[in-house]
Amino acid sequence: MIWCLRLTILSLILSQGADGRRKPEVVSVVGRAGESAVLGCDLLPPAGRPPLHVIEWLRFGFLLPIFIQFGLYSPRIDPDYVGRVRLQTGASLQIEGLRVEDQGWYECRVLFLDQHSPEQDFANGSWVHLTVNSPPQFQETPPLVLEVKELEAVTLRCVALGSPQPYVTWKFRGQDLGKGQGQVQVRNGTLWIRRVERGSAGDYTCQASSTEGSVTHTTQLLVLGPPVIVVPPNNNTVNASQDVSLACRAEAYPANLTYSWFQDRINVFHISRLQSRVRILVDGSLWLQATQPDDAGHYTCVPSNGFPHPPSASAYLTVLYPAQVTVMPPETPLPIGMRGVIRCPVRANPPLLFVTWTKDGQALQLDKFPGWSLGPEGSLVIALGNEDALGEYSCTPYNSLGTAGSSPVTRVLLKAPPAFIDQPKEEYFQEVGRDLLIPCSARGDPPPIVSWAKVGRGLQGQAQVDSNNSLILRPLTKEAHGRWECSARNAVAHVTISTNVYVLGTSPHVVTNVSVVPLPKGANVSWEPGFDGGYLQRFSVWYTPLAKRPDRAHHDWVSLAVPMGATHLLVPGLQAYTQYQFSVLAQNKLGSGPFSEIVLSIPEGLPTTPAVPRLPPTEMPPPLSPPRGLVAVRTPRGVLLHWDPPELIPERLDGYILEGRQGSQGWEILDQGVAGTEIQLLVPGLIKDVLYEFRLVAFADSYVSDPSNIANISTSGLEVYPSRTQLPGLLPQPVLAGVVGGVCFLGVAVLVSILAACLMNRRRAARRHRKRLRQDPPLIFSPRGRSGPHSAPGSDSPDSVTKFKLQGSPVPSLRQSLLWGEPARPPSPHPDSPLGRGPLPLEPICRGPDGRFVMGPTVAPPQEKLCLERSEPRTSAKRLAQSLDCSSSSPSGVPQPLCITDISPVGQPPAAMPSPLPGPGPLLQYLSLPFFREMNVDGDWPPLEEPTPASPPDFMGSHPCPTSSFLPPPDSPPTNLRAVLPGTLMGVGVSSEPPYTALADWTLRERVLPGLLSAAPRGSLTSQSSGRGSASFLRPPSTAPSAGGSYLSPAPGDTSSWASGPERWPRREHVVTVSKRRNTSVDENYEWDSEFPGDMELLETWHPGLASSRAHPELEPELGVKTPEKSCLLNTTHAPGPEARCAALREEFLAFRRRRDATRARLPVCQQSISYPEQATLL
């Protein structure tokens, strides 16, 4: 700052001189502090009386002048200079009592009042610099006493002022610290200690010196911390029963010290045997009285003043005593048949010299017991435990100080040693990740303790032992591989057995015993392979030169593949007298194992023997030699090849050709455009986990060199594979097998898909075909013996149930063909063909009281047939309403004699021969099966066509009933009922009555059975009645013989009851099976018996029925409806139950029929069709 002011003043002065004015003079005045100095000023004229003027003294940095004198007036003085300044000899200023702060620039000015030119106001002035010299004085100092914690930093600062400026230095314990060193640094008068230690405590002196004098300041530094032991304890040796003292003294700040003593890390006051014999003195020493053998050991002194981490010092106390027995067991077990030891527990200091034994109170003579000897510690060793060892023993030990006495007596017992019950196998092979159980159990007396241990490096937390002492390795890991020992130990003996565990499916284990033999510019590396993990393993040798500089510790390793099966490798091309690191790596298909330990070796140099003189060559050397030193290196970027150029090059090297191969395959050219200037190349397109071999060939002009040395490299574990097309011909066999397998699988999958699609299409077509068949007209049964619809009715071929076959329905819909009196239609091959839409005949369908159907052949009259042909376009619902009923009932519901009207559409042949009355025909028996009780009343029924339709009588004409009845009249004498039953009429002679038809036979049974069954037991035969009808199954007539035989139950093998005899009523071409059931009962209790009662039951109920028969009253015709002329058969008595309900139903139907007939009578014949086909329910 001062020199800046000086430069400013000088610049002002120079600027004034540059204006052409008089150059002022600069005066320097030096004074000492406390003395006086005169600042000269000669601006006044030297002679004469000066004009009126004003004298001013200005100090640079002050706003106002420090001194102003005008004439004879009192001067104006600055307060800092009051009493210390005055004028002397003109305008000079005298300053008394100089101070350091008075130093600076002063200017003298004289203003003449008679001069009014403003340019000359400051012309009369001069500058004076006052320098005040003073001795050094401290402006800032550290405290006299400073406390600092140990390991903390501290700063001591000294600042001194003076003129000239003083120089500050520091001293510690009288030694100049200079600029400092280590933890102490001195800079610009400041002392800085980075880390205060115990030795940093002391006096630090700060000294400020200059030409005017020097000054000093001293600071005492106190370090707060744990104590420092200045007198540690020393090792000591005493005899037993003597006193001993161990010294310990420490220093610390603060000095509130507390001493503690420990024996073997236990406070001496916490040991019961020492509490009464130990003292700690004021100076920290330990006093121990009457020492004992147990007092020997390490004693530690620990002083403390409250700060953490107190110091400690230890010493060992040795106590000398005679040999003595510690604890002799009362019993000593020995193993039977094994080596045993009788121990004598002895302690002695000085050491033990010998031990004497007694057996059974007598001195033991070992020469009398072969195999007995003394152990190194005086124990008695018995080679074979037997009865000779039994007895009581005592021992007496001796050392240089003598003996403390004999031991108590111990009795020897013979015990069974541990013996293994379940021994592990010698070897175990198991896959990694699975569980392995190795049994091991032992017995003995006392029972032994079984334990497992792994030889070498053990497992932590992976091995478990179950309750049977078996070793469990769950899961099995790679670390479990090795040798395991099972040991059994008890008080008698200790036995072990071992086994080897081989863990399969892992990477190889580390190789062992790696050795390197140095060779000239090479090394021979050998090793012992580890376990291969269950797969074939291969090895590679890795080496690298040792880093010569620490800053380049990272370097690339070079690997060389080892031939398969070899356990050594010669590494060539090493630099002589250079230290190399070698390691061996094992690999298999699952990966790489750990590297072996690193071995260091220094290859040797070439021998210095003189070379043999070379003979003149007979052949010209090749003009181009091969590349040298080809090496493959694994780098983070991939596989990198290094090589040296050929030694012999003709003129210019054009390039290299890189060749490679896998294993023993042929050489392939990988790159033939490598530049001749290159000495390294990154090989692209390599495959993972493959062993490669590379070589180089150089070419120049027309010359091609021999191949270079082969460099081996494996890509196992390589993370980066340069992306390029795979090398030709180097596709691995596993990859090729996978590709071929994938293609084969794809082909098989496509073939199976095509076959499946074909099969699904065929199934779908079959389903559509079956669906069309279901949508086609329903199927009916037809006997096999009929060749066509025009077969003769008198065919001799029997029709059994096994000869029925399925045929297509000849009509589009059953409901359209169920018309009363519709003429027969020829069968049609297809429902949509015009030929298949013609009318078909439909016979009347009746239903008896038991709910079974009666079907009779009928043919519509000619005139009705013509009408039907004309009205064919009508809907089938109207034709369905045309129905016929052959039964009648009285209005009162009482059963009346049935009048059978001959409505058969088949006329009698012109020359029909009389024939016996046939038995029940096949259709009648078929309709009497329980199956037809399941048929839907309102279901569709197919038309039944006849071969030759004849002109039938009128549709509802009143025809006479057959003159001959099936049963004798009621008033006739009783005869053999079995002869008059329908089933027994086969043997009756020729009858002149009209031919027996199925309708007549069925009507007979409908009229006779209700009366008979009413008195029959409910449980007769096989009744399967239920609330809504019985569930029956279609089956042929029963072959079980009944009590007396009847037409209801034909004899076994009698198939004539189905279809036999020359004279039969026309057979039914079709029988429709109806699968849909519907409740047709009047109420919930409407039911039918599932079977007819037996013959004996019929005979029992037959006579009462005949006795109670009466004449059927004549029915009143209603609404012009024709009634039958005669009543036939017999009357039955009224029976409650189902018969009454049937009568009620019959009355309802008769009322409906009367209404229908009345309506039909009013209409023409061709228009008599029912408007409500749904009401045409067949009963």
Curated annotation (Swiss-Prot):
Q: Where is it expressed, tissue-wise?
A: Expressed in hippocampal neurons (at protein level).
Q: What residue ranges are annotated as transmembrane?
A: 735-755
Spans within the Extracellular topological domain:
21-734
Q: How does it sit in the membrane?
A: Single-pass type I membrane protein
Fibronectin type-III domain: residues covered: 507-611, 623-718
Entry-linked PROSITE patterns: FN3 (PS50853), IG_LIKE (PS50835)
Tell me a Gene Ontology molecular-function term this record carries.
cell-cell adhesion mediator activity
How does this chain assemble? Interacts with SHANK1 and probably with MAGI2.
What is this protein identified as?
Protein turtle homolog A
Organism, as annotated: Rattus norvegicus
Point out the gene that encodes the protein. Igsf9
